[in-house]
Design a protein with these regions (language model features):
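Terminal low-complexity/charged segments
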Residues: 1-159, 314-321, 325, 343, ...
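Hydrophobic alpha-helical scaffolding
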Residues: 19, 79, 83, 187, ...
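Short coil/turn segments at secondary-structure boundaries
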Residues: 44-45, 238-241, 273-278, 320-324, ...
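Structured, non-membrane catalytic/scaffold regions adjacent to prosthetic-group chemistry
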Residues: 75, 81-109, 113, 210-226, ...
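Predominant activation on well-ordered alpha-helical scaffold segments within soluble catalytic domains
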Residues: 90, 94, 198-206, 224, ...
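Active-site- and interface-proximal helix/loop "cap" or "latch" segments in soluble metabolic
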Residues: 130, 134-243, 252, 265, ...
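Intrinsically disordered, low-complexity regulatory segments
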Residues: 249-253, 263-417
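Flexible, glycine/threonine-enriched loop-and-boundary segments that flank and lead into catalytic domains
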Residues: 410-431
Length: 484
């Protein structure tokens, strides 16, 4: 698929429907959206006092429906029984905004960490059942996360995830800032997802401001997104190799990741692509010599990655450790709202790139679902390997001509709320911007990691405790994305 074909099939702007719902009709409205084939992709609170609002987002193709209801001092009814994917959204709103959801009580703390430990632990009792607590301080140089395993022998009954230890309040900090300045909060939420978060924020703001991204701007942003996907997928394959003790594969893909990040720095001036994206503009400016040099480096990188992948693919001992471990079946993946490579490895053809207005992708973009989408570690690894090939092809196409910084054109219709959905390396990132003139009234950033952490807990149950590090690495989720 050529870039021109992508541009013809991709709408230039996000399509958003804002629908006000009476409080008494809230559950019925959400049920109708789900029954109509729409997919829950986030919820958030806004407003204050008697004008407090609860909003739920549902997606279908390039269109996003925002259902909103005013509930005042009374809490809205829960929809977790309709879509379990909403559980974290409701628990977070309870902790940060004091919302009480009728039908979802008692609500275990998610963001808050009260000293009253029984208030947030899951009681599991039975003969031979005991707990293994891991974290939040770990032996490795990683961020803070607490995993409480309930096991019989070495078999995991369930794992309770406790994150948000270093929550920074970025969404609240962004309130009152200029729309153009608010991008810094989204960009710095997570280094590994900086480009995806920045593009999502920029597209949401441009929808509010009536700006339409130009051809060059769409191409530059897609280039940055694919560069980010490249080094993340290389890193994730290296991590799985480390999880099974395959040092040769770990070292090979870690070296490939380093080369990809050095390429980022040479093209964008930053290894994590910070500072390349603006609201209504792009700072990326690559003349012919730069793109030619980058294409050559990417060609070599692709050949070396294919060679390293063959070493993994034909290693019987590695494959034996991956098959059948950490299975996430399709029904659970859909029910829990899994996105990205995790969802595709479970057989769900879900890829936001096929429905990303304002970018280079189009409706002809096909999700990479492996032939044997068993939902296990092997399938999640294979999805990333397949997507590496797609990303290399996309990058070669995007760099076929010089890339110039360009701006979005004004004069388009403005929206009362800006919503953007962008496919990050880990899956769909959803950004909502509610404006107050040219300032941020409310920012909501729901990343793929936020969506996938509950799916990780589900995939872990029934496995052996020593296999958890491997399962965890096959998801490779961000802590910072939930600590935003």
């Amino acid at each position: 698929m050529s870039g021109r074909e992508s541009l013809r099939s991709a709408p230039p702007r996000q399509e958003v429907d804002l629908v006000t719902v009476e409080r008494a009709d809230w559950r019925d409205a959400c049920r109708r959206a789900l029954d109509g084939g729409e997919r829950f992709c986030g919820a958030y609170a806004a407003g204050s006092g008697s004008r407090r609002r609860w909003n739920a987002l549902f997606a279908r193709g390039p269109r996003t429906r925002v259902l909103t209801t005013v509930f005042g001092e009374d809490g809205p009814p829960t929809i977790v029984d309709l879509t379990p994917a909403a559980e974290w959204d409701e628990r977070e709103a309870h902790d940060l905004y004091g919302l009480r959801f009728r039908g979802h009580e008692p609500l275990r703390p998610l963001v808050a960490h009260p000293l009253d430990t029984p208030s947030w632990t899951v009681p599991v009792e039975g003969e031979g059942v005991y707990e293994v607590a891991v974290g939040p301080i770990h032996a490795g140089v990683i961020e803070s996360g607490h995993f409480r395993f309930h096991v019989v022998g070495e078999r995991i009954l369930l794992v309770d995830l406790r994150l948000f230890y270093k929550h920074r309040g970025l969404e609240r900090a962004a309130e009152g800032s200029e729309l153009t300045d608010g991008l810094a909060f989204a960009q710095r939420a997570c280094g590994a997802c900086a480009a995806a978060n920045s593009v999502a924020y920029a597209l949401a703001c441009e929808s509010v401001l009536g700006l339409t991204p130009s051809r060059e701007l769409r191409r530059a942003r897609t280039l940055l997104l694919e560069l980010e996907r490249l080094y993340n997928h290389l890193n994730d394959i290296a991590a799985v190799c480390a999880g099974v003790g395959f040092a040769a594969g770990n070292m090979a893909f870690a070296a490939l990741k380093e080369r990809a990040m050095r390429l980022n720095e040479s093209l964008a001036g930053h290894r994590f692509l910070f500072g390349s994206i603006e609201v209504g503009a792009s700072r990326l400016d690559l003349p012919s010599p730069a793109v030619d040099r980058a294409r050559g480096e990417l060609h070599e990188l692709r050949e070396d990655a294919a060679r390293a992948w063959r070493e993994i693919r034909f290693s019987a001992s590695v494959q034996a450790r991956l098959d059948g471990v950490g299975v996430l079946d399709p029904d659970a993946a859909a029910r829990l709202g899994a996105v990205g490579p995790v969802a595709r490895a479970s057989g769900l053809g879900l890829d936001t790139r096929a429905a990303s207005p304002g970018l280079w992708y189009g409706s002809a973009f096909a999700a990479a679902v492996p032939p044997s989408a068993g939902g296990d570690v092997a399938a999640r690894l294979e999805v990333r390997a397949i997507e590496l090939g797609v990303t290399f092809e996309m990058l070669d196409e995007l760099l076929a001509e010089p890339v110039g910084g360009d701006i979005a054109s004004p004069g388009g219709p403005t929206a009362p709320v800006g919503v953007a959905r962008v496919e990050s390396p880990r899956g769909e990132t959803v950004c909502v911007v509610e404006p107050d003139m040219h300032r941020v009234r409310r920012l909501r950033l729901r990343t793929a990691s936020y969506a996938n952490w509950p799916a990780l807990a589900h995939a872990t149950a029934g496995n052996l405790l020593p296999d958890f590090p491997l399962i965890n690495k096959s998801f490779e989720l961000c802590y910072a994305c939930v600590d935003r």
